[in-house]
């Protein structure tokens, strides 16, 4: 069992937060008050600093889940007659493609197996062959499996062709380096409840200022219009519509702790250590990771489910939960898996404790350890 009265979330967000972050939500804020506006301004500056984008980019926060911000970025930055190339190697890439279709943006895709990263050379060939493509939209860390895509290589290719790059960095931002000075992008999109260890409820788009300035009138939506949101914030320091005040206050506190910890290098190192402990521990149980280690992001790890017919995910999940850990089901199309997150605010005993609980549960179910689905 865990030492806390509530389960540890071993998920890619929402995730386990610190007492300080939760305590920040105990105060109520006026959404038009100058003190709250100062919090918003501070968050915008701190988020920009993480990517070294102060001189070239703008941080535009938005209410809602991260997907709201992804849709806002595509709907605002891609003109209505634009053409988006989406490399697809997982569920969240597929979501971007669905957004493009829903918004009526022309779409092309490059399809990969779910256990393989995107290849910059494929994108290079596609851009060379089709001059109508205006933007490329990629997922940095595909949360469906945990595969890490080669963002910098892709960014250099897209820039060389003079196209815009939109990056869904939901599961990587704040833990895996993205540097606006060396990795060209029009937008990087992330959210409060992931690697920054805030709570869910707001996202943000880090948009290249020169790209954003050209976007007036592009958006299909009033509430998801990033250009209007940005201009209004610049003019008034306020959100256009009622902000999630408690979520904003929690993110402000989470960012303070992020800096205290040592910023991106320290956060990334902690998650990498968690990932290593997790994979090593699960392999001792005979549970095989779905991905090769060289393409595994230290955010969430997908494991093959046991092939033993006595294994049932719902029973397994509930029993692990009773021991204090909440896992994630798989999000693959062909193979039965389950996922374990490496991110969140939990102590050094968190991952070893989870591995121990998983081993006990499988043994209690009579599942033959090591009898897993073949790759």
Curated annotation (Swiss-Prot):
UniProt EC number: 2.6.1.37
Keyword Transferase assigned: yes
MF-aspect GO terms: 2-aminoethylphosphonate-pyruvate transaminase activity
Annotated GO biological process: organic phosphonate catabolic process
Residues found modified as N6-(pyridoxal phosphate)lysine: 194
Reactions mediated catalytically: (2-aminoethyl)phosphonate + pyruvate = phosphonoacetaldehyde + L-alanine
Class of this enzyme: transferase
The protein's role, per its UniProt record: Involved in phosphonate degradation.
Classification via PANTHER family: 2-AMINOETHYLPHOSPHONATE--PYRUVATE TRANSAMINASE
Family (UniProt): Belongs to the class-V pyridoxal-phosphate-dependent aminotransferase family. PhnW subfamily.
Subunit structure: Homodimer.
Name recorded for this polypeptide: 2-aminoethylphosphonate--pyruvate transaminase 2
Organism: Cupriavidus pinatubonensis (strain JMP 134 / LMG 1197)
């Amino acid at each position: 069992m865990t030492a806390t009265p509530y389960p540890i979330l071993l998920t890619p967000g929402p995730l386990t937060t610190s007492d300080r972050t939760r305590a920040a939500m105990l105060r109520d804020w006026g959404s038009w008050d100058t003190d709250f506006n100062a919090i918003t301004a501070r968050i915008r500056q701190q988020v920009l600093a993480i990517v070294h984008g102060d001189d070239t980019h703008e941080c535009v926060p938005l209410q809602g889940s991260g997907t709201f911000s992804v849709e806002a970025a595509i709907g605002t930055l891609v003109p209505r007659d634009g053409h988006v190339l989406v490399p697809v190697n997982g569920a969240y890439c597929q979501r971007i493609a669905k957004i493009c279709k829903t918004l009526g943006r022309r779409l092309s895709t490059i399809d990969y197996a779910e256990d393989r990263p995107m290849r910059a050379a494929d994108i290079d060939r596609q851009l060379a062959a089709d001059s109508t493509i205006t933007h490329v939209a990629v997922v940095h860390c595909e949360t469906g499996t945990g595969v890490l895509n080669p963002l910098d290589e892709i960014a250099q290719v897209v820039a060389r062709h003079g196209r815009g790059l939109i990056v869904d960095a939901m599961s990587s931002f704040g833990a895996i380096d993205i540097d606006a000075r060396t990795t060209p992008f029009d937008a990087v999109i992330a959210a409060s409840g992931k690697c920054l260890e805030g709570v869910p409820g707001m996202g943000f788009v880090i948009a290249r200022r020169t790209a954003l300035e050209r976007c007036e009138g592009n958006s299909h939506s009033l509430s998801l219009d990033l250009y209007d949101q940005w201009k209004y914030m610049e003019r008034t320091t306020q959100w256009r519509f009622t902000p999630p005040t408690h979520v904003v206050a929690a993110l402000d506190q989470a960012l303070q702790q992020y800096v205290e910890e040592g910023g991106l290098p320290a956060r990334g190192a902690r998650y990498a250590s968690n990932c290593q402990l997790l994979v090593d521990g699960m392999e001792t149980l005979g549970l095989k990771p779905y991905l090769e280690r060289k393409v595994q992001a230290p955010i969430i790890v997908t494991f093959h489910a046991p092939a033993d017919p006595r294994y049932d995910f719902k029973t397994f999940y509930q029993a692990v939960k009773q021991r204090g850990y909440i896992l994630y089901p798989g999000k693959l199309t062909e193979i039965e898996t389950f996922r374990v997150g490496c991110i969140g605010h939990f102590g050094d005993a968190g991952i070893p404790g989870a591995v121990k609980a998983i081993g006990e549960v499988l043994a209690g179910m009579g599942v033959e350890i090591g009898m897993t689905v073949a790759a």
